[in-house]
Swiss-Prot record:
The gene is smpB. Its main location: cytoplasm. Pfam families: SmpB. This is SsrA-binding protein. Keywords: Cytoplasm, RNA-binding. Required for rescue of stalled ribosomes mediated by trans-translation. Binds to transfer-messenger RNA (tmRNA), required for stable association of tmRNA with ribosomes. tmRNA and SmpB together mimic tRNA shape, replacing the anticodon stem-loop with SmpB. tmRNA is encoded by the ssrA gene; the 2 termini fold to resemble tRNA(Ala) and it encodes a 'tag peptide', a short internal open reading frame. During trans-translation Ala-aminoacylated tmRNA acts like a tRNA, entering the A-site of stalled ribosomes, displacing the stalled mRNA. The lineage of its organism: Bacteria, Bacillati, Chloroflexota, Dehalococcoidia, Dehalococcoidales. It comes from Dehalococcoides mccartyi (strain CBDB1).
Length: 172
């Protein structure tokens, strides 16, 4: 797999396959553009076998995904996990709602913050942690149009400064 690396153990004389602890599969880039992200939380996700295989091959899109609370549970909605090509007719539905796994106290805390402060719960990225799929959730406050413009101009000025510094160092 693309995220495994082999670690040689010279004393014992064999190779150990060491899996990377965190492997990011996808990020929700719209979330960084549309929200001020504040606190981060980790949640497990209930997936079918074909879904985890599609995730590992990188066939997932979280562009319009959001988290919906329902009867004391959290559900990931509009996350598109493509059908696994080798599954045949037993494949999963790509746009189905997927249950997020968290402790009840954590869910209650998140829901109280969402109701009280006017924050939104946004899925930021899906990653593998020791071969288990996890979703990083973040509490976010929506940006206004002028906030989005400010972040774009700040990013552009930082890029220009980096280019100038790089150019000056190159000329010496």
């Amino acid at each position: 797999m693309h995220y495994a690396r082999i670690v040689s153990n010279l004393r014992l004389g064999y190779d150990i396959i060491h899996m990377a602890e965190y492997v990011t599969l996808t990020t929700n880039r719209k979330a960084f553009h549309n929200y001020f992200l504040e606190e981060k939380y980790e949640a497990g996700i209930m997936l079918l076998g074909t879904e985890i295989k599609s995730l590992r091959s990188g066939r997932v899109n979280m562009g319009d995904a959001y988290v919906k609370p329902q009867r004391g549970e959290l559900w990931l909605v509009n996350a598109h996990i493509s059908a696994y090509e080798c599954s045949g007719h037993t494949s999963h539905e790509p746009m189905r709602e997927r249950k997020l796994l968290m402790h009840r106290k954590e869910i209650a805390l998140l829901m109280s913050k969402v109701k009280e402060k006017g924050l939104t719960l946004i899925p930021v990225r899906i990653y593998l942690k020791n071969d288990i799929a996890k979703v990083e959730l973040s509490l976010g406050r929506g940006k206004k149009l002028y906030d989005k413009r400010d972040t774009v101009t700040k990013r552009d000025t930082e890029r220009e400064l980096e280019r100038e510094v790089k150019y000056r160092n190159f000329r010496r």
